[in-house]
Amino acid sequence: LTKNIDKIKGIVLTHGHEDHIGALPYILKQINVPVFGTLLTLGLLENKLREHKMLDSTTRHTVVPGEKVKLGQMVVEFIHTNHSIADAVALAIHTPVGVVVHTGDFKVDYTPIDGDVIDLQRFAALGKEGVLLLMSDSTNAERRGFTMSEKNVGKVFEKIFEETPKNRIMVATFSSNIHRIQQVINAAYMYGRKVAIIGRSMVNAVKTASELDYLWIPPRTLIDINETRNYRDDQLVIITTGSQGETMSALSRIASGEHKQINVKPDDKIIISASAIPGNEKSISRVVNELLKKGANVVYGDIEDIHVSGHARQEELKLMLALTKPKFFMPVHGEFMHLSCHKNLAISMGMDKNDIFVMKLGEVLEVNKNEAKVTGTVPVGQI
């Protein structure tokens, strides 16, 4: 990137998850170009820029779904999607040789928490106009069927809250999953409980989302963690970080007895509302075991359906292919096995295998109106 800095017109974000925005403060220190993203995405990014004392030195442009931004010879169009974070978008990149659609991380949720369904009509319209290349999320390409709606988790929360009338409830989830946090708050409000937030990233995310009106917190529901001592256990819900067993997270410190404000009590109901990111299984098991040894009642994915994925399964991926009808297809966002599975899915729908490109890291795909081909490589690896 630094070698081609004169060619870079801007950085375009699809959503505010850590793996999509976490490196930006470091990149922007060397390549200071405008950043484009939706309101919540930029709000979460600004928390990071503030920590790096870079707020004043970076240019940020807020976009809304449906908006188009001209960058050099290309026009980038933002399309509303559903994901495990609010304000996610796909990109339709209008180039001189044709339209490239990048789905970003997405799922098709017909009953999303905010009521805003993925803009399937726009994908279909682009398909009719002609899509040169589709780049589509492959994370769940191995999984059959459809991904469940986020609303399903809310129903499980309500069931667990109803079954826990006397004990304190803690919920660990990803701090960026605003819709999941909203459902915890909804259940707490329904059962007359106060909500306290712990974990730096969780506190920041809740503050940002509520200030930008992506999170509705009923009046007198949110309390400071230090106020919890003034309430009975049956009046409390604590939302925390640490769903992946991260060593320094709030839940890990609670489990090890090192948290300054919260200690585990016998029969605390602790809900881990997330699936294990590959590689984190041992860390999560360690935390669960410690909590169980202290007498807590721990609920996780193998016990209740308290998590749904933010990524499309096979039927949703087939729908995206059917709507956009791309001339060429490049599966993205997944390991090689996920990309290969996505390729086979496209072949099963009638695409020519020669028009599908499963790329290795660093390979360059060159596309024009008539053909697509791998033309070389660029250096990749740890920095």
Name the predicted role of every residue range:
Residues 1-12, 17-230, 249-263, 282-286:
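His/Asp/Glu-rich metal-coordinating catalytic cores
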Residues 143-383:
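Hard-cation-handling environments
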